[in-house]
Amino acid sequence: MAKQIIFNEQARAALKHGVDTMALAVKTTLGPRGRNVAMGKKWGSPAVTHDGVTVAKEVELKDPFENMGAQLLKEAASKTNDVAGDGTTTATVLAQAMIDEGLKLVAAGANPMILKRGLDKGREALVARIKEQAISLKSRDEIRQVATISAQDPEIGELLATIMDKIGHDGVVTIEEGKGTTLEYELVEGMQFDRGYISPYFVTDSSRMEAVIDEPYILITDKKISAVNDLLPVLEAVLATGKKDLVIIAEDVDGEALATLVVNKMRGTLNPLAVKAPGFGDRRKAMLQDIAILTGGTLISEEVGRKLDSAKVQDLGRARRVKSDKDNTVIVEGFGDKQAIQARIRQLKQQIETTTSDYDREKLQERVAKLSGGVAVIKVGAPTEPALKERKARVEDALNATRAAVEEGIVPGGGVALLNAISALDNVQTQFEEERMALNVLRRALEEPLRQLAINAGEDGSVVVNQVRTLQREHNNPHYGFDVMTGNYVDLMQAGIIDPAKVVRSALENAVSVAGIVLTTDALITEAPEPKKNGARTPSMPDEEF
């Protein structure tokens, strides 16, 4: 396949045009006064969004060289979304400003490689300053403010603050499309997994088709139980304690073992419940180990030399209640050692830090939440399908922003954290003139988010930036900034206009990374379009009569 190549000024001009086109579509969504973007599909109603990364993912330009610029800028938004879950529009605005200023210097003869080195030096100083500014998240009110700013909806902010209050910061929150037009949530207490009872004969509440057992003994094994002889020692040991409540979590229970449990249930000799173990393969063993630690039991596995008939009462877990329906099982308040549970959570968090797989990370986070004992389901409703999807995206952004704020703290919002970080560049040691130029590129770019917020609110961006700086000096308060909703200049921290430090940091790091790539690119290669054959036409299907 033949390729087409462009170089130097022509290549940089194509990249810049692609970057500017992408940024123009994305940055209109910045801030509470930002506009929506409607995205047409080949079928169905258009999707309407206020989310920068969603807009970025839709942009594909016709010119292949310009499209390269757009796709590089998309990387800044996507990577920020992956790391922090929010801040995608800020990353886009920053990257475009750096590319715009940097390409002017390259056109004037500056060495792009030294410019990039200057950008990297400046980034390190700026990230350190953002981390210094960060204040740890303490109150429910601050959580509400972070979520409200991200979602641009006080109702979503209040809902997430309530949920975090009830399930803790490590709890799992899943977001679903609801049936009505309102926002609702449902709390699931304890550890839940997606396996239900093996037989409906174990049901204790026939109206709800649920099996509920209070304070049972819990046998945990990765073995399939078919022979009754494997179960007898455990059944006898439980009955010897004067209790008859037993939950069995196993790969499967069938044959005469299942028949024995059902018959004893019918006679009232035992009150058993058998459920299938969650997960598959190695993940199943890990989840069974989690259940064992949560309930204070021991995983009976032949891999560690334990056969089922060797199980004693001491090996069985305990919990305040186990509830199971045909699809799900919930273990409420396991009797496991609190220190052992915390140690397991720490171990899982270390695995989250080291894993490179997004899927594994998600599953590990679910396990942490289940051990922490909190799962919430948010049901998002709206009058129409496009409104529902747009609102759901805002709830997801707000949730991600809240988690990011818990992780690394909060900084003043409204673009002020980046504005305040500019002074950190004064202490950066430079060796070449181009490095000093790169620091000036960063100084100008860091003003851009505040400038764009003001423009989207119908104000003059440069006037707002200068006024914020003047008021900060007059009040000797670095938290002073512009409230886009009211048009007033206020103490942003007191007004609850705050951003997660992790979001601001990630946006800056990814913007610098993409800007460095664009500035140091001097040639673009893409596939040449196939020439059209003269006189060729698409053959038509012959007419057919039926």
Curated annotation (Swiss-Prot):
CDD domains: GroEL. GO terms for cellular component: cytoplasm. Its main location: cytoplasm. It is an enzyme of class 5 (isomerase). ATP binds at residues 29-32, 86-90, 414, 499. Keywords: ATP-binding, Chaperone, Cytoplasm, Isomerase, Nucleotide-binding. The keyword Chaperone applies. InterPro entries: Chaperonin_Cpn60_CS, Cpn60/GroEL, Cpn60/GroEL/TCP-1, GroEL-like_apical_dom_sf, GROEL-like_equatorial_sf, TCP-1-like_intermed_sf. It is found in: Cytoplasm. GO terms for biological process: protein refolding. Its EC number is 5.6.1.7. SUPFAM superfamilies: GroEL apical domain-like, GroEL equatorial domain-like, GroEL-intermediate domain like. It catalyses: ATP + H2O + a folded polypeptide = ADP + phosphate + an unfolded polypeptide. The keyword tRNA processing does not apply. One of its GO terms (molecular function) is unfolded protein binding. Signal peptide: none annotated. Belongs to the chaperonin (HSP60) family. PANTHER family: 60 KDA HEAT SHOCK PROTEIN, MITOCHONDRIAL (PTHR45633). Forms a cylinder of 14 subunits composed of two heptameric rings stacked back-to-back. Interacts with the co-chaperonin GroES. Together with its co-chaperonin GroES, plays an essential role in assisting protein folding. The GroEL-GroES system forms a nano-cage that allows encapsulation of the non-native substrate proteins and provides a physical environment optimized to promote and accelerate protein folding. This is Chaperonin GroEL 2. It comes from Roseiflexus castenholzii (strain DSM 13941 / HLO8). The gene is groEL2.
